[in-house]
Amino acid sequence: MEKFFSPSRHNYADLSPTDVPASEESDEALEEKQFEYFQQRQHRRLVLVNRLLAASTVALVMVSLWLGWELHTAKFGSMGSFQYGFKYELEAAKKVIKLEEYKFLGSPIFLDDGTELVPEPTPGPMKTLGVTDMYVGEPSKELDWNWNQLHWGRFFLLTEDEARQAWGPGYKEYWAENEGGYIAGLEVTHSVHCVDMLRKALRRDVYPLDSPLHGPIHTDHCLNHLRQMILCQGDLTPIPSKYYRGITDNYIFGDMPHTCRNWDSVREFITDRFNGSSAVPLAPGTVLSDPYKKLLGILDE
């Protein structure tokens, strides 16, 4: 008879931490190190990204500033431009500059019999700077009034900041005690005044000297100043000539279009600075005599 034996009984106890195999401990440590490495790597990436963003922002700002300066230089140049105002022009006046195309008038023509005359202007689409007979011809009160309107109120006061900007560190030498401030006139009205003085000098029988300050030296000053202004402006508009049978030759024809600054805007600016809302007040305590009141528009002529 076969004998069956039951398996022997064995007692099992729970494993203690010290009984865990070394391979399992090393796996956990490795996972912790990997996690720590991953966190450090992510931190380094974030730092690098932030630095790149900061550097890119700085570079973008620098490029924008550089491009802005290049565009400014291209637009204005180091000395300014005819359209936006030149370096030495009054800053406040630059804001009123507008360019216009004007057709000049007044060139003489010759008839077939040799008669010289200035024809009546024909209406056209282009603006003009006034018809010829408003400013030339036999002296008259109307003629004088037309000229006076061009340079009337040409002197006005500047603020101290404007004087400093216009004339530099030595601006205080231009203080005008009698007028109570820094008195100035724009070049355009100074030049027109000079043309008017030369017009009158040609007819001393009608316009005797009204002041010893307007004698021959002043006349020479005006002539030489206009010479310099014309050369300084250097207008490059080509002026043609036309053939006339009456003189069997060509003669200059100056009635051509020119690019100009809008005169009405400039004239309005001068008037407002002279006695309008933007006029600079006299220095406190200034007592003006009648000639200076007339000069500054406080007393009518």
From Swiss-Prot:
Subcellular location(s) per record: Membrane
Membrane association type: Single-pass membrane protein
One MF annotation (Gene Ontology) recorded for this entry: oxidoreductase activity
Alphabetically ordered keywords of this record: Glycoprotein, Membrane, Oxidoreductase, Transmembrane, Transmembrane helix, Virulence
Region (Disordered), start-end ranges: 1-26
Membrane-spanning residues: 47-69
Pathway(s) of this molecule: Mycotoxin biosynthesis
GO BP term (any one): mycotoxin biosynthetic process
Transmembrane found in the keyword field: yes
Pfam families membership: UstYa
Predominant localisation class: membrane
Top EC category: oxidoreductase
Deleted gene: phenotype: Abolishes the formation of phomopsin A and leads to the accumulation an intermediate with no modified Asp moiety.
Known glycosylation sites: 275
Motif (HXXHC 2): 218-222
Superkingdom of the source species: Eukaryota
GO CC, alphabetical: membrane
Documented EC number(s): 1.-.-.-
Motif HXXHC 1 per record, residues: 189-194
UniProt note: domains: The 2 HXXHC motifs are conserved in ustYa family proteins and might form active sites.
Function summary: UstYa family oxidase; part of the gene cluster that mediates the biosynthesis of the phomopsins, a group of hexapeptide mycotoxins which infects lupins and causes lupinosis disease in livestock. Within the pathway, phomYd catalyzes the desaturation of the Asp moiety into 2,3-dehydroaspartic acid (dAsp). The pathway starts with the processing of the precursor phomA by several endopeptidases including kexin proteases as well as the cluster-specific S41 family peptidase phomP1 and the oligopeptidase phomG to produce 10 identical copies of the hexapeptide Tyr-Val-Ile-Pro-Ile-Asp.
Family: Belongs to the ustYa family.
Protein name: UstYa family oxidase phomYd
Species per Swiss-Prot/TrEMBL record: Diaporthe leptostromiformis (Lupinosis disease fungus)
Gene: phomYd
